[in-house]
């Protein structure tokens, strides 16, 4: 980071300062609005933020390998949450939710900018005269709408690659090894770096074959970073290698798409990307890349621009790999090798943000160096991409979703807790038309949940509750039986919808639940976002209605009478 401000290029210094100001501006809605901000719901408010709070208050943040969290599904394994060696869990331990969230966003985006800037200036676009490309591309990369709980899993790749390429080139600086040491403490191996290290390992092998020499220092750098991830992710490694109890992932089935569907998905992913690794590259970035390809073809510069060509090919291959991972032609292999279902190898496409933005910088460099008359176009593409990314700020994209305060509705659930009048650990609840993360965030002990893996026997027991509804609707039956990450009270009438606001006119008219298993599991109350007209037929009694001006929900509290 020190090097950023030691550059002798005054123009570059101004660009860097300007980039940090723009990053701060991008983060300003979180800073100014706090819990009144709009942020991503999917795989964020509906899960991770609640998990962090549950973990922080559970007393099991640093629990043993066999520890459980009683608040979720009568004892969700502690290992289902992130390791206590990951910095993000401590942010949520010591700070309020939105302070922790904002700090995490700031850390990730600043490191993303620094990493991409260092990578480009040292190994890709080395000319000081092109600093507007390196700084602009690094800024654009840092503003991408990444998956919040992914941390540096994708946005930290440029910094790690910078360090590893330095080591490959014989540079023994302590900064490289410090980078390889620290990044794993704010990233996830399964959400990016397993695939990154695998790719770098392949690159090392290619290097060794091409040069007919083993670069042992480079290999040791790769292995060292891998070892650091194994230490940080020790819970995950233990669960993967030593846990014998079947989990919900053992019923995960992914190979279902036809060849034609997979082919369409290839091009869709290539142009639009994926919601966990959003790059917003389909307009200005792709335009720059295709303009550079046309320039290369016209001037027959295939050899001199082979890095750019290789990145383009790899980018497309990764999109195809992602799409065809879900091709049903894999079925014979998945039946023979079960780990192909339980581990998501499609995530090699998580390398694409790194590849796309390095390609963007190279494309802009090719255009400028090809002809000075392209300079204006290059600046237009770069500024256009940055402006486009500002339009993808959460506060704009999710303006029609609940704010954090509205979503978790702490005042409403405090009133429900007071109304029930029992210690929360003495009874269990479940939700209908509402994410169970909301109840979990408010301290209720839930029989429903959204988690990556949990006991398969629990999934089967929970299924008994919703079996009559699953039989009515093949879509939700398949969703639950062949994935099951959302262990929810699914209903035929509501389908896969879990955010019914108080303005909704939706009612459940033909609900059919088997609540005897629910009671046997400790269930006493149902929190429903919609009224249930045939509650009595399901052995439920309306016990109260709760809402407030600060929430978007109206909670119908039903007591189970069996």
Regions found by a protein language model. Give the residues of each.
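Start-transfer (signal-anchor) and selected internal transmembrane alpha helices
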Residues: 1-31
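Transmembrane catalytic cores of multi-pass membrane glycosyltransferases
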Residues: 30-87, 152, 186-344, 348
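Extracytoplasmic
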Residues: 383-454
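Aromatic/acidic, Gly/Pro-rich catalytic loop(s) in extracytoplasmic/lumenal soluble domains
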Residues: 509-562
